[in-house]
UniProtKB/Swiss-Prot annotation:
Subunit structure: Part of the 50S ribosomal subunit. Contacts protein L32.
Name the record gives this protein: Large ribosomal subunit protein bL17
Gene: rplQ
Organism expressing this protein natively: Leuconostoc mesenteroides subsp. mesenteroides (strain ATCC 8293 / DSM 20343 / BCRC 11652 / CCM 1803 / JCM 6124 / NCDO 523 / NBRC 100496 / NCIMB 8023 / NCTC 12954 / NRRL B-1118 / 37Y)
UniProt keywords, alphabetically: Ribonucleoprotein, Ribosomal protein
Molecular function in Gene Ontology: structural constituent of ribosome
Length: 127
């Protein structure tokens, strides 16, 4: 299995990929290094594919990877609805890509980081 180590142990790497994937699903775009973005793109595409399947097993598989973070707070008078990242994946993000077979993200190169000249990129969901 080919993957990037990203200078971390396996548990640190998995935690970082979970965090970045969840942030991308919540916000729609993140700024990170090119190597990280290429790895996050793989995990994000897998999560969106699970969201498109939409069955209970797919929801459980996605729940093991996506962080349990608040994605949105909707206030309607006295009602306050809190939407988690998992709910946003299945209710908002996955239906946007119902007609698309993969390629849910795009990587746009930006400037190099000042401290170590690492190539920074913007990773965003395709509209």
């Amino acid at each position: 299995m080919a993957y990037r180590k990203l200078g971390r142990t396996s548990s640190q790497r998995k935690a970082m990929l979970r965090d970045l994937t969840t942030d991308l699903l919540i916000n729609g775009r993140i700024t990170t290094t090119e190597a990280r973005a290429k790895e996050v793109r793989k995990t994000t595409d897998k999560m969106i594919t699970l969201g498109k399947r939409g069955d209970l097993n797919a929801r459980r598989q996605a729940a093991t990877f996506v962080r349990n973070e608040v994605a949105d707070v909707i206030e309607d008078g006295d009602d306050v609805k809190v939407q988690s990242a998992l709910q946003k994946l299945f209710d908002d993000v996955a239906p946007r890509f119902a007609e698309r077979n993969g390629g849910y993200t795009r990587i746009l190169k930006t400037v190099q980081r000042r401290g170590d000249a690492a190539q920074l990129v913007i990773l965003e969901l395709v509209d």
